[in-house]
């Protein structure tokens, strides 16, 4: 038996009239829907039961046959087959049209496919189809040309003159005749000949025509099928009619549109039977044509047909398009059963992998499992009584529920799901109340807080789904962020504050210099008030359980504080004892200066030493990363839970509060402001004398005030007491920063107006002093702009993510090694002298392409194809090596994806990437998710051209859409020397002298030069400040230069905003933008000049002709923006579900495209498992068996794969 869901590819094409009739179960002859008295469908109408099947299961129209035993019987009285009512979702009907009509997609699309096939203009076609002109279909022996248009008057004149020696007609019938007469092979040969000589517009037109004609020739579609003789009627359940409360009916718009077609069709039939005058018949045919147009795509031509209240009716095309269309609403996003949502509250007592599920919700979600268990335990006799027990909530139900949810993970999701950490799995524990409890450490990943956020719960049902949830999605498994490989579960707010307070040191605290034999004794002393948490004490090192101490150190005393003793208890034994927040202490061992000989004067030694800084949020993050690197995930998650508990406990003990008295106003503030004001007055004086321009005055005033603010900030931070609660909050990284503090206690400073230009009047007051009315008014400008920006940014960033996902969704790790011999030469990314991304960051987790040797000693640091770990990267960076050749996604040879070696390490797990990992989607999420943190601003620094470069989110969109950038730089097309810079008519010209030729570049007005005479310049380098247009760069240089430029630019934007993203994510996206080439000369291949081809398709076509010793084709690489690249993908399902649905489908149907179902979207649409992860063929054969608790040993969580 064939499996309906198991097919290799999906093909789309034009349907012939016979094909449409073969789909149909009967002809719809009447426009009636249902009888309003009996509420039964009318016979032969749009809801007819004889055509589409019965309305009720196993029951015919007249009621003669009822019950399932008559299955398959066709009633002799009403002709309805007795079957399930579900067939009304799949059975189609048809309408036999009295006159052929054209299909609006093929006639009206851009370019008009019908027009290209017939070589007629769309305007001429329109005149013929809508009965305004005649077209000559057979010229006979008259001087008329075939396809010539004739007006009514001309037609009459020629008829009188030549009689019936020629034929001309109107409407779709005429076009159909012309389409049937076309000899595709002859036309194609003729066009190929023409291409050899044609130039300009004629050449472009010929290429377009050739593409469409070749498509028809190769796909087996007949051009005449673009004209409809038969109209399919979609199943009635897809255009339902429902009764409302008041007895009125609500119906789908399609029924109205079908009704108009049937009415006009029947009237036309009657007129033809009566032999009505041709003018009336023509008018009726035109109306039929318009009715069919409205049904297929309402509003595409002329005014749309409207329903009640002047609302345009939704046609078949509208059912597919847009967010509410079939693709995005029903095929790509379905609502699921076994789900619930509720408000979240914090669950500080949960373990990392747990969540609290409200009892009533759990009972409803796990209902089938509970019912099964009730029957198995004999607590209920059958399923029905089990169901009744649950609905009445009888006490025994709760015990069963407890046992059912053990070992059964649930998925929690918070919208918006910006990256894969927006859905994670947890083990549920039952809680009272109606709120979901969430572990505080996973909030960062979800971006959740407890001010009323809601979350959704989903239950994985099959054992495979449960296994995947447990092994891959459990919150304790997702400790690292896929975008940069740094821990995402770092403590925040209270937890940070507690650990910060715990590790503080204070000079002269109670009991300073006491010596204890072990940690317990120190704790005892603390609990009895002899020492404080912050007291610096000594403990016998041998009693501190730590594997990194040497034998010598164990015989000494360790100087530390009571708080640090408590803090170090949470770390694994073999981890260094952390006494100071430095990397050397974290990675290697405790510094020797903290060990003293027994018998030394401890008090003196302690008194002579500085206080050691406490552990801030950043240090805690580093500790987590280090523990993760050395130990298993389980160990890390245990440590995180202990860190969380410590944090909450000691932030409670600390009792840190904020009061107005904690905000101390700086005494020297007035002095600083006076000085600044004097400088500003001086600048204004110079301006009035005409010594400086308006621009300069503005810039100087701005810089004076920002300097004043910086001075105040510096002095404030110095004058602050280290015990000040606000300082502790910002220093620990719990909340707030230095700038917030300056605004509270110093001055608010300069504000921007709504256009983003800085207002030169600063706000001199601080919040502690209070703002004047004018100052308050100025500050509202910036605040309002901030709120408006945030709202816009969220939508923009979401749309960016959607486009990124779409372009990269089929990039999957497909093989272990593609065997490429190319690599990418990388160094640190710099902007001026500032390093934006260091070489170390770019090397970690990549494979070396070529051996790296020490520049001085020549020893091999990294071998070819070796993974560069953190340690190796440090060694390479410190050796003074500037550039390293690595394997990169840019140079990967794998088709439809990348290989393991070129991708490198999976950032989310810190291990090698697995075959089947959907790295394209991960890349898209990693770039899109921080999008909301980028600013919307185009910074206006007083409008100096070249300075107004776009930054933030708009710049990222500019890069990925490959648009011409704002403030575009002029680039040199040749290597050479800057020979001269001349002034020509208030502009400048730069002359670049190369070895062979000299080029002169006109510099746009107001652009700032980047070069000086005599300077060496290479091709593709900027002559002026600004952003390079990557398309220009591609013309001048090669693909590699463009790839590196785009990568560098994206990293610049994100790093400037303090967001770190792994290079490999950007590489995957940029690679997708450069996948296509445009054929410039076809050689002796089958490809058409001017067409876009995938690089692999192009090389295949060339390989084929080269083997036969023929002339290969040539092509140029093309840079496509992500939207364009998504629409150019090979998969028509993916493209149609993205944007421009009708255009994509029209094109695909004519070409008879096959979708090979390689990407993820295509498979989601047709309901197959996605071909990534465990859905890949190589993993499909695995059988999962649910085991008991004893077998489930956490260490052995490998799943064995049988090939």
From Swiss-Prot:
Q: Which InterPro entries match?
A: DNA-dir_RpoC_beta_prime, DNA-dir_RpoC_beta_prime_bact, RNA_pol_asu, RNA_pol_N, RNA_pol_Rpb1_1, RNA_pol_Rpb1_3, RNA_pol_Rpb1_3_sf, RNA_pol_Rpb1_4
Q: What class of enzyme is it?
A: transferase
A Pfam family annotated for this chain is RNA_pol_Rpb1_3
How cofactor binds (record note)?
Binds 1 Mg(2+) ion per subunit.
GO MF term (any one): zinc ion binding
Subunit structure of this chain's protein: The RNAP catalytic core consists of 2 alpha, 1 beta, 1 beta' and 1 omega subunit. When a sigma factor is associated with the core the holoenzyme is formed, which can initiate transcription.
Q: Which family does it belong to?
A: Belongs to the RNA polymerase beta' chain family.
What's the protein called, per UniProt? DNA-directed RNA polymerase subunit beta'
Taxonomy-wise, where does this protein's organism fall, top ranks first? Bacteria, Bacillati, Bacillota, Bacilli, Bacillales
